[in-house]
Structures are given as C-alpha cells and as structure tokens.
Amino acid sequence: MLEKEEIVSPNLEELKSHYHSIITLLGEDAGREGLLKTPERVAKAMLSLTKGYHMDPHEVLRSAKFQEEYSQMVIVKDIDFFSLCEHHMLPFYGKAHVAYIPNGYITGLSKIARVVDIFSHRLQVQERMTLQIKDCIQETLNPLGVMVVVEAKHMCMQMRGVEKQNSITTTSDFTGAFNQAKTREEFMNLIQHGRV
C-alpha cells in the first residue's frame, strides 16, 4: 500500500476552483454549508487517487532486488487495489495476482504489491494496468517469466450505462515460461485453490 502522506500540489487551488464550478454547473449551491469544503476535499482526493503518476515502479523493484538462486514460481496473490476508469473517472476495484519465475534475482514481496498500487493510482483501463504491471516486473527483474491476472468490478458498469452490479472483469497477460499452458495452469490452480 502506498504511504498516506498529505498530498501537496501546485495545482490544488486550480483544481478546487474547477470542482467549485462543476458543483455550480450541476445546479447546486457550492456555497451551502454541506458543500463549502467539498471542492478542496475532492481536489485532494483526486491528487491522492492519481499519485502513481509521480512514482517510479521500476525504482521500487530495484530498491529491493536481491541475487538469489531460487528458480521456482513466486506468487503474490489477492493484492487489493482500486483505480479510476479513465473513461468516466469512476472507481474500479478488485484483486491482482502476480507471479514470476526468478532468473537469478528476486524482489521484496511487498514491492510487487507496491507496483500494483502505483499503476492503479492513475487514470486507467484494466487491460493496460495488467500489461504495465507485467512489463515493469519483466523489464526490472528479467525473470524467466511473469504472469498477471486482475479481477475487478467497475462502477462505470454498475452505476451507469448497462447497470450490471454483479459483473466481474478478468484480464491476464504473461511472458516467457508462462507461454507454456502447463505453467499457466499451475499458476491459476495456485491462485484459486492454494489458500493458507
């Protein structure tokens, strides 16, 4: 999980002004008691929800890259995340499951979760986020293979449009050893049935 420090941005005042205008354009009184601080709250929330733009996920992995001869699958599963759909700026949220097969180097397990957090704290589409997580791990650790599966619920499908409240979207991407169906099957079995 990303640190919860206060977000400081030179754009805060301008964002507040725009959110004040949006509230007014929606037909509300931006000056009434319940909405007085809303522009500032929303501006700070948006800066927090998109702070991944100001973080380097490759550096996160490099900061805990260790030489190790372990060469079997490493899986970090059930990584909770939330993000904002870039089309409607509504949340989507779910779990990411990440596996890699080391090739002389491993990384701290928490760093995998941080990579997911960094890419999810941006305006996103689930498909691209899945690809970015995979590419970041592949490029930084150069493992024998990487596989990422992301399962999410999208508020843009639940609250508006088709209004399908129970739909779940699953995306996956993989490299190297995971091109073999047997290796992918092992990963899928472990994330579905391998509970502690």
Curated annotation (Swiss-Prot):
Its EC number is 3.5.4.16. It is an enzyme of class 3 (hydrolase). GO terms for cellular component: cytoplasm. Transmembrane segments: none annotated. GO terms for biological process: one-carbon metabolic process; tetrahydrobiopterin biosynthetic process; tetrahydrofolate biosynthetic process. Pathway: Cofactor biosynthesis; 7,8-dihydroneopterin triphosphate biosynthesis; 7,8-dihydroneopterin triphosphate from GTP: step 1/1. Belongs to the GTP cyclohydrolase I family. PANTHER family: GTP CYCLOHYDROLASE 1, GTP CYCLOHYDROLASE I. This is GTP cyclohydrolase 1. It comes from Bacteroides thetaiotaomicron (strain ATCC 29148 / DSM 2079 / JCM 5827 / CCUG 10774 / NCTC 10582 / VPI-5482 / E50).
